[in-house]
């Protein structure tokens, strides 16, 4: 699981500096950007595979299926299961 701290260490700056520069350049904080990438990967996996939500959560770097469901529902206003069914 990639964190803001990992990104900052890789970039050779503090997490605070990374957050500021990241938001200045991309318009969103790095944590939000990471979550958006994870949710995009989740959507692709739900559309293209039959992997269980638990496996998808692990694969995209979230701690649990519960965490994935909560974040998915907050962002997309639907559950991962309902989203997958809409592509079947």
Q: What do the predicted segments below correspond to?
A:
Residues 10-11, 22, 60-61, 72:
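Core residues of bacterial helix-turn-helix
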Residues 4-5, 24-65, 85-88:
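Terminal helix-turn-helix DNA-binding modules in bacterial transcription factors
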Residues 17-21, 67-70:
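Base-recognition residues in the alpha-helical recognition helix of bacterial helix-turn-helix
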Residues 66-88:
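…primarily DNA-binding HTH/wHTH and HhH modules…
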Residues 1:
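Short glycine/proline-centered loop/turn elements that form peptide/ligand docking sites
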Residues 6-9, 17:
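An amphipathic alpha-helical interaction segment
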Residues 13, 62-63, 78:
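The short coil/loop that forms the "turn" connecting the two helices of the helix-turn-helix
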Residues 8, 51-52, 69, 78:
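Extended, subdomain-level signal for the structured scaffold at the beginning of enzyme domains
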């Amino acid at each position: 699981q990639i964190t803001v701290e990992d990104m900052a260490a890789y970039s050779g700056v503090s997490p605070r500096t990374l957050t500021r520069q990241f938001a200045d350049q991309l318009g969103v904080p790095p944590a939000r950007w990471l979550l958006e990438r994870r949710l995009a990967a989740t959507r692709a996996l739900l559309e293209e595979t039959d992997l269980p939500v638990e496996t998808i959560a692990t694969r995209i770097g979230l701690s649990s299926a519960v965490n994935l469901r909560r974040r998915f529902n907050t962002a997309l206003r639907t559950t991962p299961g309902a989203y997958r069914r809409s592509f079947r």
